[in-house]
A protein has these predicted regions:
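Solvent-exposed, charged interface segments at domain starts and junctions
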Residues: 1-7, 62-67
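Lipid-handling modules and contact-site tethers
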Residues: 4, 8-12, 16, 92, ...
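Intrinsically disordered, low-complexity regulatory segments enriched in Ser/Thr/Pro
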Residues: 55-107
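Negatively charged, low-complexity tracts enriched in Asp/Glu with abundant Ser/Thr
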Residues: 2-55
Length: 117
């Protein structure tokens, strides 16, 4: 990849986090936090993976006490955004950073965290 391509990817990643990831997390907090015993908040936890350049995480605590932490992250120089339940590492989903939508990401975060849909 050339330097221009890396710059374009970096800009796109910033755009995705600002306009897709954070709004999805804020929407989940508004829709679920303190509703029917759920606790939902943004946390600083992240996966232990080399090369992660940017990430955001949300914790969903279910009424019975079960906690799920969903991390959305980007590995430097890739064109993939990953949503992963970092407490159940085998559960993840990747998205193309140039086509990911709020709806796709919200649906996957709900699925990975076990939230009602």
């Amino acid at each position: 990849m050339g330097q221009d391509s890396n710059w374009q990817i970096d800009d796109r990643v910033d755009d995705v986090f600002n306009n897709v990831v954070i709004p999805v997390f804020e929407s989940l907090i508004n829709d679920y936090d303190q509703v029917d015993g759920y606790e939902v908040k943004i946390v600083s936890d992240g996966p232990l993976i080399l090369g992660i350049e940017k990430y955001s995480s949300i914790r969903i605590k279910h009424p019975g006490g079960l906690e799920m932490i969903i991390c959305v992250y980007w590995v430097k120089n890739s064109e993939r955004l990953i949503a992963e339940n970092i407490l159940l590492i085998t559960h993840n989903k990747s998205f193309d950073i140039f086509s990911v939508t709020k709806e796709e990401l919200a649906s996957q975060v709900k699925f990975l965290s076990g939230l009602k849909t």
